Amino acid sequence: MRSRILAIVFAARHVAALPLAAEDAAATLSLTSSASSTTVLPSPTQYTLPNNDPNQGARNASIARKRELFLYGPSTLGQTTFYPTGELGNNISARDVLLWRQDAANQTATAYREANETFADITSRGGFKTLDDFALLYNGHWKESVPEGISKGMLSNYTSDLLFSMERLSSNPYVLKRLHPTKDKLPFSVESKVVKKLTATTLEALHKGGRLFLVDHSYQKKYTPQPGRYAAACQGLFYLDARSNQFLPLAIKTNVGADLTYTPLDDKNDWLLAKIMFNNNDLFYSQMYHVLFHTIPEIVHEAAFRTLSDRHPVMGVLNRLMYQAYAIRPVGGAVLFNPGGFWDQNFGLPASAAIDFPGSVYAQGGGGFQAGYLEKDLRSRGLVGEDSGPRLPHFPFYEDAHRLIGAIRRFMQAFVDSTYGADDGDDGALLRDYELQNWIAEANGPAQVRDFPAAPLRRRAQLVDVLTHVAWVTGGAHHVMNQGSPVKFSGVVPLHPAALYAPIPTTKGATGNGTRAGLLAWLPNERQAVEQVSLLARFNRAQVGDRKQTVRDAFAAPDLLAGNGPGYAAANARFVEDTGRISREMAGRGFDGKGLSQGMPFVWTALNPAVNPFFLSV
């Protein structure tokens, strides 16, 4: 497997791995040049608004040249947003692929070495005899590729219903919704006496009281698993318990075969298998839904690239945030989603299903830019605000995301004020910035950015919102579902297998001899489990701290600090301080006297800004 990824030959093999001053490259690039002969010039050393540029003519000509050479091409990896094409677009894609390969090389080699060591150790200990033996996968292993280790509690508490339910409010919060008391119907029924015993009330009362929540993966029923692998298409009902004030699971419906509905009152192995089947669906969702966290900022940046000078302060920040961004789709197509590639080797549903899914979400109206703003998204699903039910007592994702976005927003507000003048609060400065307005028009026009702020952009608060959201997606939202999260949280086995290896049961009580060992038939064997962890470990980026590429470093690029003046430098200093405070709190998390952290029996740190890259890493 190692040789397959390292031996891939990309067109970008000889492209210089330095930041591309695209405007200058466009001005000098020969129309007949290849991807290996891109002219690379230094980044701008002074950022300025177009009306303040003493050489507006040359500036406008350079933008026109970029528009000739950087074009919107067909979507790849599913039918979502445009992917760059044209001579300059192809060169930038090739450059980013090379940057990605350089960044990933050490992580890849380390994960492969540690995989071999882990497999040898598991084999020497006799392999997996019970579900508890999956701890052999992790104990003492992956210390270099995953230096933070997997989440505390994720193995010791993997049978906990509270752990299972609270994953919806942390590791994968993007699929959960509260069922509105009047606008939403009950998705399926649960036996009344079971509901009464679990909740001390009725399903209808939970619904009416705004205490019922749904995760719906029934759409996965349309996909056919690979030979020898199996998948349900689970729906899960969760409820906010009025007695304990905890968020708990109520029922899981498989939607395939006999279409069984499981509850916590079933045999403990049947119920644990139901949670495993659900998490298998959930892992597919998180890994492929997150593709939209690539394509949305990509198309926003593409529109900016064709309309803003590289000397524009906003372009400088966007270029920084979109470091190596255009590598992910070609790399994914070459080694992850290719037939027989890493996806097919590890997941139950085939790569063709994985590629189809984000396009299906997009075709059904997903992928809206403003709809993805944190507060707006969570309110639309009834998870914050009290319009449709009682407040969630613990919402770790929202708690951490709110703080990180607050730090990003403070930076962006200071950046926008220093760029356009803070003293008089003159939002007319935005209207006079014709490049900025061209970007907004381009995004709403040829780029077809869904749900982008309308042109013209009149208020600087709107610009702050846009820039904050791009930085949040590239350095926050993406990493909740990808990057290091799967190997540390959402992909930890035995609770989160990428594939199931036995048929979905048609009757209850089919899970063996009453011990957890009976569940091994559905789970990956020793080699398959090591391969899953190895793949997910390769998604992690353990070296970003040493390379000064963390979220804390997002705005500290030397050219940005040198070219934007003291206001920018002061904003960056505060951002570093704010994110340092957040990081220290996260790093110090542990369990309270009840064995809980943020109301969960596992420690969640997926948004740590001192650990995560500031960019779309994988």
Swiss-Prot record:
Residues with attached carbohydrate: N60, N91, N106, N116, N157, N513
Lipoxygenase domain segment(s): 47-617
Posttranslational mods: N- and O-glycosylated.
Annotated compartments: Secreted
pH note: Optimum pH is 7. Active from pH 5 to pH 11.
Cofactor: Mn(2+)
Keywords assigned by UniProt, alphabetized: Dioxygenase, Glycoprotein, Manganese, Metal-binding, Oxidoreductase, Secreted, Signal
Secretion signal, residue range per the UniProt entry: 1-16
Binding site for Mn(2+): H290, H294, H478, N482, V618
Molecular function as annotated in GO: linoleate 11-lipoxygenase activity; metal ion binding
Temperature and activity: Optimum temperature is 60 degrees Celsius. Enzyme activity decreases sharply above 63 degrees Celsius.
Xref: PANTHER family: LIPOXYGENASE
Family to which this protein belongs: Belongs to the lipoxygenase family.
Name by which UniProt lists this protein: Manganese lipoxygenase
Organism annotation: Gaeumannomyces tritici (Wheat and barley take-all root rot fungus)
Source taxonomy: Eukaryota, Fungi, Dikarya, Ascomycota, Pezizomycotina
